[in-house]
Amino acid sequence: MEPRGAAAGEPEPAVSPSFQARLWKNLQLGVGKGKGGGGGRAGGPERRTAATPTPSLPPPKTTQDVGSTGSRWSGFKKRKQVLDRVFSSSQPNLCCSSPEPLEPGGAGRAEQGSTLRRRLREHLLPVAKGSSTAAGTVGVTPPGGRSPDSAPSSSASSSLSSSPQPPPRGDRIRDEGTRRGSPEAHLCHQKSSSLPGTACLEQLLEPAPPPAEPARRPAEPQSLQKGEELDCSQKINPVETSNADVPLADPGMYQLDITLRRGQSLAARDRGGTSDPYVKFKIGRKEVFRSKIIHKNLNPVWEEKACVLIDHLREPLYIKVFDYDFGLQDDFMGSAFLDLTQLELNRPTDVTLTLKDPHYPDHDLGIILLSVILTPKEGEPRDVTMLMRKSWKRSSKFQTQSLRLSDQHRKSHLWRGIVSITLIEGRDLKAMDSNGLSDPYVKFRLGHQKYKSKIMPKTLNPQWREQFDFHLYEERGGVMDITAWDKDAGKRDDFIGRCQVDLSSLSREQTHKLELQLEEGEGHLVLLVTLTASATVSISDLSVNSMEDHKEREEILKRYSPLRIFNNIKDVGFLQVKVIRAEGLMAADVTGKSDPFCVVELNNDRLLTHTVYKNLNPEWNKVFTFNIKDIHSVLEVTVYDEDRDRSADFLGRVAIPLLSIQNGEQKAYVLKNKQLTGPTKGVIHLEIDVIFNAVKASLRTLIPKERKYIEEENRLSKQLLLRNFIRTKRCVMVLVNAAYYVNSCFDWDSPPRSLAAFVLFLLVVWNFELYMIPLLLLLLLTWNYFLIISGKDNRQRDTVVEDMLEDEEEEDDRDDKDGEKKGFINKIYAIQEVCVSVQNILDEAASLGERVKNTFNWTVPFLSWLAIIALCVFTAILYFIPLRYIVLVWGINKFTKKLRSPYAIDNNELLDFLSRVPSDVQVVQYQELKPDHSHSPYKRKKNNLG
């Protein structure tokens, strides 16, 4: 007699909807518990109705019972329990619990199943009252498909074996389990939708038998495309086992090291038959890496490395390739998926991915070559994703906190060193413009950090002399990409060349002068590169406080003592910031709450706290430590509201100069608006400590300030333009008023004042020496100092500037409201008035410089000859006559001019002379044009006659 397991490969009919409905109804209502004796009814599955529960198991050992049992259970076995469904990542696994160990069992052995399986079995498969069959024997079926004690029935067996029926449930599970070579194979799937499939439920109700058959060769893994559906009987085949470790199914932290090697035979998207490809890596709709752009190449070589931290392997790595188009939307060049569950742990794997376009699956788009290593992470990873982010997205509370800060009470250093780069010059760069020159600038990139140099116009040998720093996150340093570009206004910048610097090959604590040859171009770049040890930049919990540890505090004080002046001159001091809590923050969500987190910035160092959800009074209790490079820097603490679908909302900001900090004092700072011109809602409690070397700080003052890499772009604002104009006008008016005062002394408007000024002038000029100029400034500073310490502070609050700032803030508030009283036309007129005033001032300043230039250019020869004569006379006077006599004569002339000619018009001879020299605009206006003979009346008449 052929066993029923032989028909395992035959096609099985689909499950009828009515059967699924009945089974699901049984699961919901539990009608089987009250119908223990209803299972002995004769008839096959055709007689079962919706009110009939799943048949119970009869007592074995009789041929009649076995035959009836086979008849009743054939309703299950004639129908393949298939329910096609798409995996859902939003629902838990409802039909499968954790896998239980599978042991061979007999008729009298109790089942060691889970509580969920036992409850479902009691609910769906009730045992008949008075039955001698133990519950533990349910589903434990030998290979013949019968109970161990049952006698074979010729009639029942022949009828079952002659028809192409599916194997019994136990055989089918055992066959699939042995094919996979894993006891966990009886799990239907790890993810399911909201309703469990009938096959999964039936599989759950019967414990899997022991592997009685020899294991078969595992089937080849099948790749799953997006939108493809799976059924419960068609399980995913795992990768063939090897000696290497296989990723666990349980969630855990992994590190995925990816090396993007190259691309081959990529698609051409540009008109010239080439492309400018770059690659994006995404995991779960989040971009985790973007490569550099390889210009005009269909076989690009990147050789870039990326390190990605992932907390599960369910999401595949999504690779997308694009063609860069300046000013336009980048063209799609293909995509591919990498199933992370197929990777072996701690083993480098070379991967070749074929790019496909979902809309055009038949197109050949080339391949991408990668090298990947998947390693499990133990403990909390260092946070390398929290710096210099422009927006913050929320995935989940656990993920956000684990990505940002360590939950353990320990200190977490964020980077392991600093690479200081000085861009000196470029030599013999390639000419990209039609005039034989270029407008070069340089871009630097190290991981996610970027820097762009200033543009040097019209030169092939630019001198930049710029210095900046990058953070090192890896011990080996990494590779820094450098590209040179030519700036073109109004169109795409031209690529000049590229080069790379392998930082791992450079020794630390030493300055290296590098002359780098540009690849794919011409010329050299000259750099100075210095790798330093780890800076004092870290995040820790409040329980780990460097300043409260007496021994560590002594080490910090010793490091910045006055005796260690020349030890790392750039390391000026140490800053520790305790971000304790905030109170009364602004409600940014519709629920009346906020999800606040805090950003602490010191120049280009930018650190974040974790997010406290649904709270207007958050407590962070975090300690930040920074390395001070400039004691004149300003510490900025900004509070944001984390938003799920867009960039973070601003809640408040406070700016604190380092020199104004009182060490060890916990202080509540009132939050201000974005412009720091007025208060906003909420306060933040901080405790700050600053330790620095005064000599290093003084020397650093004479060096240019560090430029911030991330700055908000300035927008055109009427109030801002008006404010700057008024400030400039006030500065100029100081000089104008001083000139008016001196002129009033010359005019004898007040005879006593003019007489006193005349006598003072004679004494000062007669006894004047050049050293008296700095002495006068020193006396002025000393006088103001004694006024301040004596309580006679003559400094007044600048109410004019405050009023302007308040007006600017009010103007910003009014701009946000639709019902503004002032019309758009009035705004245009107000802006026009300010612009006209600025235009006139700029015109006068530019005209003055152009007139001086045109004087020496002999634009007007008469004036140039006159200037030569005047300069000769003044040269002779200065050579033969002392300076004090010249100034004395000039002063006497000015003081007596009004007395000699009361109605004379005051003037300045030098400015009067320059007013006669035309500016460049006037030169063009005064230029005589040559007549065009083609437009002469005579030629026009001659052409008409022809």
Swiss-Prot record:
| Cofactor entry | Ca(2+)
Subcellular location(s) of the protein: Cytoplasmic vesicle, Secretory vesicle, Synaptic vesicle membrane; Recycling endosome; Endoplasmic reticulum membrane
Gene3D superfamilies named in the record: C2 domain
Record's SUPFAM superfamilies?
C2 domain (Calcium/lipid-binding domain, CaLB)
The Gene Ontology biological process terms listed for this entry are: negative regulation of cell migration; negative regulation of endocytosis; negative regulation of response to oxidative stress; regulation of neuronal synaptic plasticity; regulation of neurotransmitter secretion
Free-text tissue specificity from the UniProt record? Expressed in the brain and central nervous system (at protein level). Isoform 1 and isoform 2 are expressed in the brain, kidney, liver, heart, lung, skeletal muscle, testis and spleen. Isoform 2 shows a higher expression in the brain, heart and skeletal muscle.
Q: Where is this region: Disordered?
A: 28-193, 205-229
**Residues at which Ca(2+) 3 binds:** D433, D439, D486, D488
* Comp. bias intervals (Low complexity): 143-163
**Protein name per the record:** Multiple C2 and transmembrane domain-containing protein 1
The organism of origin for this protein: Rattus norvegicus (Rat)
Which taxonomic lineage does the organism of this UniProt entry have? Eukaryota, Metazoa, Chordata, Craniata, Vertebrata
